[in-house]
C-alpha cells in the first residue's frame, strides 16, 4: 500500500484497488456462480433494506448466495483463493495490522435491474463502537471491521450499487436522517465505480449504503469482512480441512499476534 493509497483511504474511508483479479480469475468465479445461482435467494419484500425511502425503492430485493467456500471442486477454488489473495494481503496488513483474520464468511451479493437500494449505515458519528471504528495514532491507521469486495462485473457511473459519504468515518455527529434515506445532500454522496477484477476496501465506520441497480447487466460482488487478529464480531468457526497454510492464517480464531499467531507478509 503506497503513500498515495494510504492518503486516499484515510481521506475517504475506502479505496478501489484495480486489477486484483485477472480476467481469467473473474471468468472462473462467474462460471462458478452461474453453476450455483439457483441456490441463492432474493431478499423478500418484508425484509426490505430501503428504509421506506422512495429514492431507494426497487421492485425486487437484492440477491444473496453463501456457502461458496464449501462448493465442490473446482467451483469453490476461485473463492478460496480470494481469502488470502496476494493482491489483497498487503492492504489488509496496513489497514488492520499483520495477523488480520476473516471475521465473516464471504458471500455473493447480486443485484438485477430494478433491485432496491440500502439505507445508509455504518458506525461513524457520536459514541465509540469497539467493533467498527477508525483511529489514527502515531503514524498508523487502526480499523475495526473492514470490508473487502471483489467485483465480478463492472459498476459504471449511474448504474447504482455501493455509495459512501467520503470522510464520514471520522465524523463526530450523526448522519441526518434525510441524508441516510438519500433524500438530501446528494452532492456529498459518492457512487463508487469500478471494473470487474477490482477490489473495493472500506472500513465499516464509513457511512455507506447502496443505490437501486439500473444497469441491464447484474451487479456481482463477493463480500467478506476482516478484522484485527485479536478481535471478533461474529463467533469463530471450525477450521476447514481444505484450507492451505495461507488460508489457515486468515481463518484462525481471534487471539493476539504475540502468541505466535501466523501472519502473512504478502
PLM region spans:
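Non-heme Fe(II)/2-oxoglutarate
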Residues: 39-52, 175-179, 196-199, 206-266
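Short, P/G- and charge-enriched loop/turn segments at secondary-structure junctions
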Residues: 131-138, 187-188
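A structural signal for short, well-ordered beta-strand segments
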Residues: 104-107, 148-150, 222-226
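Short, glycine/small-residue-enriched coil/turn segments at secondary-structure junctions
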Residues: 85, 136-143
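Phosphate-binding beta-loop-alpha motif at adenosine-nucleotide cofactor sites
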Residues: 16-17, 203
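Double-stranded beta-helix
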Residues: 7, 141-211, 231, 246-249
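Non-heme Fe(II)-dependent double-stranded beta-helix
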Residues: 1-11, 18-134, 255
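Histidine-centered catalytic micro-motifs
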Residues: 118-124, 165, 207-210, 224
Amino acid at each position: 500500500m503506497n503513500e498515495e493509497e494510504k492518503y486516499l483511504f484515510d481521506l475517504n474511508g475506502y479505496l478501489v484497488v484495480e486489477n486484483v483479479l485477472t480476467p481469467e480469475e473473474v471468468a472462473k468465479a462467474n462460471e462458478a456462480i452461474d453453476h450455483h445461482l439457483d441456490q441463492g435467494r432474493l431478499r423478500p419484500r418484508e425484509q426490505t433494506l430501503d428504509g421506506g425511502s422512495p429514492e431507494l425503492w426497487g421492485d425486487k430485493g437484492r440477491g444473496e448466495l453463501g456457502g461458496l467456500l464449501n462448493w465442490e471442486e473446482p467451483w469453490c477454488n476461485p473463492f478460496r483463493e480470494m481469502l488470502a489473495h496476494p493482491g489483497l494481503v498487503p492492504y489488509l496488513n496496513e489497514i488492520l495490522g499483520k495477523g488480520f483474520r476473516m471475521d465473516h464468511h464471504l458471500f455473493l451479493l447480486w443485484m438485477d435491474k430494478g433491485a432496491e437500494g440500502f439505507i445508509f449505515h455504518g458506525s461513524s458519528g457520536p459514541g465509540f463502537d469497539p467493533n467498527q471504528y477508525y483511529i489514527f495514532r502515531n503514524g498508523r491507521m487502526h480499523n475495526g471491521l473492514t470490508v473487502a469486495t471483489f467485483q465480478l462485473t463492472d459498476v459504471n457511473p449511474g448504474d447504482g450499487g455501493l455509495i459512501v459519504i467520503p470522510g464520514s468515518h471520522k465524523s463526530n455527529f450523526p448522519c441526518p436522517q434525510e441524508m441516510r434515506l438519500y433524500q438530501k445532500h446528494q452532492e456529498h454522496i459518492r457512487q463508487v465505480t469500478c471494473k470487474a477484477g477490482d477490489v473495493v476496501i472500506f472500513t465499516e465506520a464509513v457511512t455507506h449504503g447502496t443505490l437501486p441497480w439500473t444497469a441491464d447487466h447484474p451487479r456481482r460482488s463477493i463480500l467478506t469482512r476482516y478484522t484485527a487478529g485479536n478481535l471478533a464480531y461474529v463467533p469463530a468457526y471450525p477450521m476447514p480441512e481444505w484450507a492451505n497454510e495461507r488460508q489457515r492464517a486468515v481463518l484462525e480464531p481471534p487471539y493476539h499476534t504475540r502468541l505466535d499467531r501466523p501472519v502473512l507478509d504478502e
